[in-house]
């Protein structure tokens, strides 16, 4: 990578984050999705303080398998922060990982939030990202990001409907002319499906399973409408004997286990339709609704929703990444602060490398900014250090920054 590319990459470190209950996705401006890892942190408490051992993929492998002094936890619950300190450490880890550990990476961050989150919950997300090293944090509502990522025409004078089924929440929204006409956040989603599967196995088979096993069942054989006689072997602990046990379950089992969760989602969709103005309702009859999020990958969920609502139901092309992609697109159209000043002031080059013939012209041509070379580029750093020592106000400012 050339010098100019490195400089441009530092300038383009703004990030969009889909901070999900189950997974966190990061989009870097101009680079697309660069990180997709579980929102899991492994910690150990020493001297009353939490010390992070692992984050993301590595931490998820520890869920339910850690010794007593180590905890593998999800710091977000129902789409909002449940543990501020651990969330801060998780965001900090992801920022460093994306920017290769550069200590000076202080990106501007756009984070999506559930529509039902309170002002206190939203401030907690902003504060956590700022404490993790962001220089500025802005928020976007999750269904808007999902709709943008799914390429729905939300800026037009027609109705668009999206149902984003994440880990902690299901976001239901109707949009038109770039705004939300109706929105509702249901705290039933992927995690609730896993919990329902755990409860079903305990009740019907006297088998205790963990959340990870429940998630595997959902992905392998889970369905909203059973269509065949497939079976799946489930291993767990027999509640009567306490010994390991294996049972075979069918699609009928999973459909029954998930029935109540899916019914709650359908009722939420019907509430949205009843609250939608008649003019937009007519659009939805033709346009239907679009499903995004990991929960939309449940087999036959589109068929069940269509059958019970009477609307066409479409699954987005990349449902797992829709929110992150939409947040990234919104970031591309959000002008960075001070950009107007930089257009006028330009950038100033110092150091011996700035004496390379025409380097200012090359940088100006490729950035569109005025580029100035300092009067004494070789001595700028030394002169500035001397001024900081002589000027108490500057010296105090420098100290306060570090």
Model-derived regions, located:
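Nucleotide/phosphate-binding catalytic cleft detector across ATP-hydrolyzing
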Residues: 1-165, 173-290, 296-402
């Amino acid at each position: 990578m050339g010098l100019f590319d490195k400089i441009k990459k530092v300038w383009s470190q703004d990030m969009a984050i889909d901070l999900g209950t189950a997974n966190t996705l990061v989009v870097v401006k101009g680079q697309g999705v660069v990180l997709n890892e579980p929102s899991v942190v492994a910690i150990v408490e020493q001297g009353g303080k939490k010390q992070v051992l692992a984050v993301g993929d590595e931490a998820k492998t520890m869920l339910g398998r850690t010794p007593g002094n180590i905890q593998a936890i999800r710091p977000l619950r129902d789409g909002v922060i449940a543990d501020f300190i651990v969330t801060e450490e998780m965001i900090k880890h992801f920022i460093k990982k994306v920017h290769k550990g550069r200590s000076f990476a202080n990106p501007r961050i756009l984070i999506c939030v559930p529509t039902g989150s309170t002002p206190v919950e939203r401030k907690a997300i902003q504060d956590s990202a700022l404490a993790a090293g962001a220089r500025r944090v802005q928020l976007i509502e999750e269904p808007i990001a999902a709709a943008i990522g799914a390429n729905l025409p939300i800026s037009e004078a027609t109705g668009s409907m999206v149902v984003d089924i994440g880990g902690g929440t299901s976001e239901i929204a109707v949009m038109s002319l770039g705004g939300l006409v109706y929105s509702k956040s249901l705290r039933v989603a992927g995690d609730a499906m896993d919990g329902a599967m755990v409860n079903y196995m305990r009740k019907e088979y006297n088998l205790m399973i963990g959340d990870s096993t429940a998630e595997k069942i959902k992905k392998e054989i889970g369905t909203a409408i059973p269509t065949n006689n497939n079976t799946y072997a489930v291993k767990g602990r027999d509640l009567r004997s306490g010994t390991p046990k294996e049972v075979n379950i069918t699609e009928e089992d999973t459909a029954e286990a998930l029935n109540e969760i899916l019914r709650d989602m359908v009722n939420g969709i019907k509430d949205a339709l009843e609250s939608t103005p008649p003019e937009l309702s007519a659009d939805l009859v033709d346009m239907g609704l679009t499903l995004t999020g990991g929960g939309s990958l449940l087999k036959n969920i589109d068929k069940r929703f269509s059958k019970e609502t009477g609307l066409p139901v479409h699954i987005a092309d990349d449902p797992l990444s829709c929110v992150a992609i939409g947040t990234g697109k919104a970031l591309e159209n959000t002008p960075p602060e001070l950009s107007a000043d930089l257009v006028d002031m330009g950038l100033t080059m110092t150091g011996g490398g700035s004496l390379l013939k025409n380097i200012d012209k090359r940088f100006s041509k490729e950035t569109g900014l005025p580029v100035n070379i300092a009067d004494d580029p070789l001595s700028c750093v030394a002169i500035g250090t001397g001024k900081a020592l002589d000027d108490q106000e500057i010296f105090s400012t420098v100290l306060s920054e570090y």
